[in-house]
Amino acid sequence: MLIRPANNDDRSAIWRIIGPTIRAGETYALDRDLSEADALAYWMGPDRETFVAEEDGVILGTYYIKANQAGGGRHVCNCGYMTDPAAGGRGIARRMHEHSLEHARARGFRAMQFNFVVSSNRRAVELWQSLGFEVVGQLPGVFLHPTEGYVDALVMFRTL
């Protein structure tokens, strides 16, 4: 699997991945009716670096990395990951995360923080914990899940 920086030619493949995830409204605090243009502007924004995971010429996942805060907090990075639902369970998110750790270290980040991991996204919570993240905060009932109602969001953190 090749993980490489995304470019404008990847936009339709990235939308094919992030669009259904956004529309489902189960894991990201984004408007479910976000337009393709706005979703891509968010995912590929100028404040972040965006990557794609590609296998045999097919993009199966994407992630971004950015500084979590400005100024005195810019040594901590934040990432977002999405994989093609049809490619779930193949370790793509794990591979992208491993790549993001290496990239974060190379960029001089000292830690990685996920600000809003929806607690009902159990696969993600378990994956991040298996990769050394700790839950350092729990925000009660802050995410309105489309089928589970109000659920908690977790703040997850690890040093690099």
Per-range role (PLM):
Residues G89-A104, V125-S130:
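Conserved acetyl-CoA-binding loop-helix of GNAT-fold acetyltransferases
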Residues M1-L2:
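Extreme N-terminal starter segment of soluble prokaryotic enzymes
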Residues P5-D9, T27-A86, H97-H99, H103, ...:
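Acetyl-CoA-dependent GNAT
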Residues I14, I18, A39:
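Hydrophobic pocket/interface hotspot
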Residues Y81-M82, L139, H145-L160:
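Terminal substrate-recognition subdomain of acyl/acetyltransferases
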Residues F114-A124, V142-L144:
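Conserved beta-strand-loop-alpha-helix junction that forms the acyl-donor binding cleft
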Residues Q129-L139:
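Conserved acetyl-CoA-binding loop of GNAT-fold acetyltransferases
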Residues A104-V117:
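Conserved GNAT acetyl-CoA-binding A-motif
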